[in-house]
């Protein structure tokens, strides 16, 4: 249960004022641009800042770290500040390093598989070919925002909406995951590097 809670924390109200929906032609062109970008991504590494907003708390919870992704499914989230925590996805296995204590589990149940797939898709921005979301696209300043609503009842228990913010190069700059309670988790990526070599040891715990 702790691992599931952590994954939801990792992943985890919409006011549309000032947002301009993309036309059908614009939306199609944007999706094609993102899909083309995704096909070129073999690896990605980035720093991130994660902000967790809870309604009952006066201040948001902020954590920082690094993320490493190697297509198609290897992913390492490293929290470095204010605590040390790693979670590594490798196909159907998940490994967790909690301040030096390593544990392992199989991602063979329904919720783990969905969350695993969701995390990888969110990082890469490859959400448009999934049948589990209703997608609406907006212009928001210099960014393009994809607003996704889960269709799956299992995911809806944990996630109300997902907002992906794409930069001009069609990569994800920011992710906002809104829970049914309207609490949310927002992750901002900085210093992104694409297709630079990542040693296999990064995905080994």
Task: Annotate each PLM feature.
Residues 1-5:
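Positively charged n-region of N-terminal signal peptides that target proteins for export
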Residues 128-134, 139-205:
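Gly/Pro-enriched, hydrophobic low-complexity segments
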Residues 20, 66-117, 185:
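An acidic-aromatic
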Residues 48, 75-79, 94-97, 146-148, ...:
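Short hydrophobic/aromatic-rich beta-strand segments that constitute the beta-sheet cores
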Residues 18-49, 53-59, 204-205:
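N-terminal leader/targeting segments and the immediate start of mature chains
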Residues 104-143:
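Flexible, surface-exposed loop/linker segments and immediately adjacent secondary-structure boundaries
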């Amino acid at each position: 249960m702790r691992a599931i809670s952590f994954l939801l924390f990792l992943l985890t109200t919409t006011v549309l004022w000032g947002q301009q929906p993309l036309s059908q032609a614009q939306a199609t062109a944007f999706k094609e641009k993102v899909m083309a970008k995704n096909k070129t991504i073999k690896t990605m590494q980035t720093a991130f800042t994660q902000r967790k907003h809870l309604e009952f708390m006066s201040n948001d919870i902020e954590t920082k770290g690094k993320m490493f992704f190697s297509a198609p499914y290897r992913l390492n989230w490293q929290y470095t500040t204010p605590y040390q925590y790693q979670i590594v996805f490798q196909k159907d296995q998940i490994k967790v390093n909690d301040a030096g204590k390593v544990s392992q589990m199989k991602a063979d149940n329904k919720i783990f598989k969905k969350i695993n797939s969701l995390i990888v898709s969110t990082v890469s921005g490859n959400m448009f070919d999934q049948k589990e979301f209703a997608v609406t696209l907006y212009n928001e300043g210099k960014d393009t925002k994809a607003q996704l609503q889960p269709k799956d009842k299992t995911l809806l228990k944990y996630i109300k909406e997902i907002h992906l913010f794409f930069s001009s190069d069609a990569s994800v700059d920011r992710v906002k995951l809104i829970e049914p309670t309207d609490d949310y988790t927002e992750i901002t990526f900085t210093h992104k590097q694409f297709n630079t070599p990542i040693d296999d040891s990064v995905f080994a715990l």
